[in-house]
Amino acid sequence: FLRPLGLRLKEVSSNFGNMDGVNATFTDNQILYNYPIESVFYVYNILTGENKLIESYSAYTQNTVKPLATAVNDYSKWERHGLENPHFYEVMYIPKYKMYMRLHLKETEFDKNKSVAELSDNRELYLTCWNESFQFLCEVMLPGHRYNYYTGWCGLYDGLLLYVNNTTSKDELNDLLKIDVVRPITK
């Protein structure tokens, strides 16, 4: 039997280019969801129906995306808009440590003399971590010119797997599958 959930989904307009979708992660009793356009995220408890806003702000990047002045169907404007604003990815649950992790990209200045791929792969990538109660633990910048920013990661039972494949790193461009796994330091 199906029942509607009390998710408070936003209507995100096309004024945000290709950042108008919702990211969702499912755990045993929760649905975590967020939007690429803002640093905050939401937690819906499947058992109680409670919907909670988690206010989490980056110390290193903008925390909200500025909309395009008008809705446009020009993909090159969407690409530029995407580069000049941060991009917040899904919140992932790491069961072994009962913690949550999220990646996000810092905004960058558009340079018409560089390709979109070069500008994209030169962006700074940040990892933010929270404990099981969604209390902030840390925010760190990951090594530059190392990772694939287009779904080049996944949450694991005991960490975050990142694919080592960035077009700006000549050392990492080959046919071998290379990965890094980020795990918390425990005592």
Model-derived features: positions:
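Surface-exposed loop and turn segments in beta-propeller and other repeat-based domains
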Residues: 1-18, 52-83, 140-148
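Loop-centered beta-sheet repeat module
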Residues: 1-45
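Structural signature of eukaryotic scaffold interfaces centered on beta-propeller domains
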Residues: 14-27, 83-96, 153-157
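Hydrophobic beta-strand positions that form the internal "hydrophobic ladder"
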Residues: 30-32, 100-102, 160-162
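Beta-propeller blade signature
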Residues: 38-49, 116-135, 174-187
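Short glycine/acidic-enriched loop and turn motifs that connect beta-strands
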Residues: 38-40, 107-111, 167-171
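Loop/turn-rich, solvent-exposed surfaces of beta-rich toroidal or solenoidal domains
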Residues: 82-132
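C-terminal structured domain segments
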Residues: 117, 125-168
